[in-house]
Amino acid sequence: MTVVIFLSVLLGAILLGVPVAFALLICGVALMLHLDLFDAQILAQQIVSGADSFSLMAIPFFILAGEVMNEGGLSKRIIDLPMKLVGHKRGGLGFVAILAAMIMASLSGSAVADTAAVAAMLLPMMKTTGYPLDRSAGLIGTAGIIAPIIPPSIPFIVFGVASGVSITKLFLAGIFPGIMMGLCLALLWWWQAKRLNLMTFSKATKQELCISFKNSIWALLLPVIIIGGFRSGIFTPTEAGAVATAYALVVSLFVYRELKVKDLYKVFLAAAKTTAVVMFLVAAANVTGWLITVAELPIMLTELLEPLIAHPTTLLLVIMLAVFIIGMVMDLTPTVLILTPVLMPLIEEAEIDPVYFGVLFILNTSIGLITPPVGNVLNVITGVSKLPFDQAAKGVFPYLIMMIMLLLAFVFVPELILVPLQWIS
């Protein structure tokens, strides 16, 4: 009965158009009434404690760093360097999009923000040079979902806080899978570009390449500082967010000089709005997560799937299928917040590496960002490209299949994630 109430209230509220955070609170109140636990003071305490975590402080810092980079010219220079490197090849703008998305992923950790930035800069150029708009939009959208995998990743921070898994290990574990995603996209785009009569650009001279590298070096140093810093123990992932923000501000204000002091209010306001949405969602989900634990739903799920515990690969396939279906209709962050407390006891019982599972889980929920009918990233590229939703979904489809195949490869061959993690660590 508890499961029925949980699902019916949550899904009913979402279908009625209630924002997810408020839907989670309504669901939490319904569960408290059902379990005869309702107390306004306890409800308030759970909401406050949900956002009361030192690790969560990284989220506003990385969001602010992303806003500063977009306004301060770092994003523009990041795209210019791949343009000079591979823009002259057949289908070069596609490779530029992939490279730019990977570099920007290592700066902000937000799929929606990275996709919007890359699409706004490259899609008009791809359209005027004769690239198929649906495939181009699909490629950029899929490249955008690399952001939650390559550190610094906001979804990894959320998962780490919800599960108790080391955020530093999650960050390091995401590096190789993120690179693999980029390589697979580049391979598929190369195969597609061979069959298309696409316009090519003149090859950049060594002087132009040097100038572009010189202009972008300050932006490229940021991921090196962040990853090198928390890997060597100089600072934690949370402190890395503050370092990223400070670095982006200094470079934008005093090196590139594209960000003016008068623009800071607008930048901070945009970051504050985005942060408020995410943190309220985290706080609301804590109420539901607490009640899920009190109602012993994780124990019930463990008992239900007990025959599969001895077969970790089969268990992971079942979980990944369920997460994929849920990810089709729910955004990444609420999916992570709702399912993590339910799934982690099962993962521990099956003795599956929690860091490995975290990478699979976030990759799967990231795929949901480009999967109809919801797909937030899919909506972004639809808006930027002005394509009908069905055409954008058609453009994403081959890359979506590629990402699903890569996810399955990681499920069947855990060493693809665990061995590089050992090397990096």
Language-model features: locations:
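Alpha-helical transmembrane segments of multi-pass membrane transport proteins
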Residues: 1-425
